[in-house]
Amino acid sequence: MIEFIPLEYYTKFYYFIVLFVVFITFINSKVAFLQDRNNLKNLSLVGFLLLFFILIYMGLRPVSGKYFGDTSTYSFIFNDYKTDNIQSRDNVEYSFRFLLQICSKIMGVNAFFFVCAILYVMPLYYASKKIFNQYWFLAFIMLVTSMSFWSYGTNGIRNGLATSFFIYGLTKSTLRTQLIWFVIAFGFHKSVTLPILGFLLTLKFNTPRGFLIFWFSCIPFSLLIGSSFQNLISGVFEDDRLNSYFYNTTQLSEFSKIGFRWDFLAYSATGVFAGWYFIVKRKFEDKFYTKIYSIYVFANACWILVIKSAFSNRFAYLSWFMLGLIIVYPFLKQQFFKNQYAVLGTILGAYFTFTFILEVIIGYR
């Protein structure tokens, strides 16, 4: 466990390290050619160093509820399994329950969180490697610089595990294998039902135009009757955790504000615009990209319907975890700009700057 860094600076230290890596990548994009073999080797080396740092730094963090949210809650649940206390066993989904059962028998709580970090980060690495081959680092860094990445590796751990397995499942070549991984993802957190539903819809309706119309329609709908929609959803599901996301206002200083989050909407719109620009404006034809873009737009539109809820960021995460892929994918698959690597470097810099300002400088939660 890493104890030499004060807890109050632990998360900020992570962002400063990532800032340094982003800065190096930004400079590299201005002075080097992406296709150069030596440059690709250097980028891969930086990527592996970043991967190693994240695994160690996230996985060996101290157990603290004050600074890492639900980390302390999961430590209590783990200790219940360790001591055969059955009180917590019916409160977690089957994949996470299986993980707890195995880990509690052979390791301590700190090692358990390290395993969680591996299961959270490595699927993103493997997915980046599978989709982008030698350019994997640029996709990976877009994923780990997302505004929600650190939070869902240290706070909403089950959500993070579920979405990482979902992304990994998307890379599989057969529908059967994809669905198997989606079932595993669902077993970590039921909220991943939303992107899974989006995936199933794309099997029949993989046309971005329809999803875009739905996305834009949800904005005025949410402004006018969003609260009524929240009441309807909470009544249908009758889930205490879901209802607390809608109505709990006792911990707003630690989470998000209530009200229509125009800042979150603007952040989400970057992905909506990116996909529209490449698919519609630049006529980029790629079935996989069209699919993940449609899933993103669908999940984000559903979040807009409940954007006024107390924990709006947790619903937004069900689309935000794909945002980095939506932005970077076309850049690594087809030539669109004269100095495309330099353009991508600028976008990466702007993308992480937004995250850095919100998380480190002002703190959006």
Where are these regions (language model features)?
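Transmembrane-helix motifs of polytopic, lipid-linked glycan transferases
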Residues: 115-131
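Membrane-interface alpha helices of multi-pass inner-membrane proteins
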Residues: 177-201, 304
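Loop-to-helix entry region of an early transmembrane alpha helix in multi-pass inner-membrane enzymes
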Residues: 94, 106-120
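Multi-pass, polyprenyl lipid-linked donor-dependent membrane glycosyltransferases
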Residues: 140-141, 151-166
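Short hydrophobic/aromatic helix or loop-helix immediately within or flanking a transmembrane segment
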Residues: 70-107
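Membrane-interface transmembrane helices that cradle and orient dolichyl/undecaprenyl
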Residues: 160, 166-177
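Alpha-helical transmembrane segments and terminal signal-anchor/GPI-anchor hydrophobic tails
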Residues: 67-76, 97, 198-314, 359-365
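Transmembrane-helix signature of polytopic, membrane-embedded enzymes
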Residues: 128-145
